[in-house]
């Protein structure tokens, strides 16, 4: 359920692409510094977006660090990086999210990969829990609710996707301050979008395997594709509305690129492969 909140690289200037890469590398670097090489396995575009958003919103409140270094992925050529206070926050959330997700994969499917990842991330997550107990508790509680809905075979899209929406709302609420309502709104609607897009993307595979998918019945109804498009548009419109109320200046064009264009890339790719059937 990761990798949907991405930039549209084709629509970015070379300078904006470089700034995104420096933020991505900065998050990777801080994950490594806090949690070691194993932690870097949890790096995602989704947490890079949160880092960009919080770093822009709270610009000037914490020191900005920049540099250029070699890394395990780039051992020959140095890469530029940047990080600030929110970067460490996102680094902790990254390992916690992947830990609890791996825990669920082992508990639900007896996935050996999940078990291995859970063991690998146990110590880093314990450190993250100490620093961010509210957020980590919310991750576990929301995933538990989601597991219950899935066990029941629920097709209540609002309730099921709302679990992941609540989870993301808690993570976006960095400081519980006067920006909380808008940050929580962005996280909530983006979380619902991510969950439903993941279900939309996985539907064919889930149908073949006979595994749970909340869209199992809906996809058989006339107008399914149009309804999903409307749901996605509404959720992202709510994200954008709350985002535009925030006084973000740094990287605002990059953030808009992600929210208005990048988040649609995987939907557009999937939709192009499975266009709506023409009415007979």
Feature names for model-found ranges:
Residues 1-185, 192, 196-233, 241-251, ...:
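Acidic catalytic motifs of isoprenoid enzymes
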